[in-house]
């Protein structure tokens, strides 16, 4: 298959790398987590991608009727310097060569005017205040959100029109599964909050994150400053 996917299409099984493991079987990920929400975003060094990666980590426990994985157009070996198996609560698939992006016909845009929403501009503005410098003439991958069944069948697809046109957080993913009647039956109660998420390091051990030092959410200092060493070397990717 090649080209844009729609509900009813079927993704091929493939092997993928993460920053902490190589040649993982996509078949196994689906078997363990379907219905799987699979979100494709730009490279992991981009402030928008980093913002949503942090947001998904913070709200991960709000998604309890399916699984989630994030795909980024970055090299696994470079991300391995700051991302280990316990850094994120969800799998981070690395596709630096864009094999899946090309297979699924994910659009690219050159320059920010055609790819940035208002939220994306706000994220980029804050990132620049903290030292981020976007590459000149860089091509940006627009996002794609899929929900996949255990055999790789596409249950839902949405090609984003801007860099932030993805589920806002994991609670939004849960709501989408329920709206589409795809929620996996659960034997346990819905978690009340995210207070027990354990992916964060002590605040005095974690660096500040360039581009994510939000002035608008000072009550959430823990999250904004201790998403581990997640993004320490990413800007070079």
Residue ranges and their predicted role:
Residues 95-165:
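Thiol/selenol-based redox catalytic cores and closely related redox-interacting motifs
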Residues 1-28:
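N-terminal "domain-start" segment that seeds a small globular fold
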Residues 50-103:
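Structural microenvironment flanking redox-active thiols in thiol-disulfide oxidoreductases
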Residues 26-56:
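Short active-site neighborhood of thiol/selenol oxidoreductases, capturing the structured segment around
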Residues 41, 72, 149:
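Short beta-strand/turn micro-motifs composed of small residues
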Residues 183-237:
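Cysteine/selenocysteine-centered motifs that mediate thiol-based redox chemistry or coordinate metal-sulfur cofactors
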Residues 11-12, 37, 142-144:
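Short loop/turn microsegments at loop-to-beta-strand junctions
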Residues 163-179:
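A short, polar/charged loop-to-alpha-helix boundary motif
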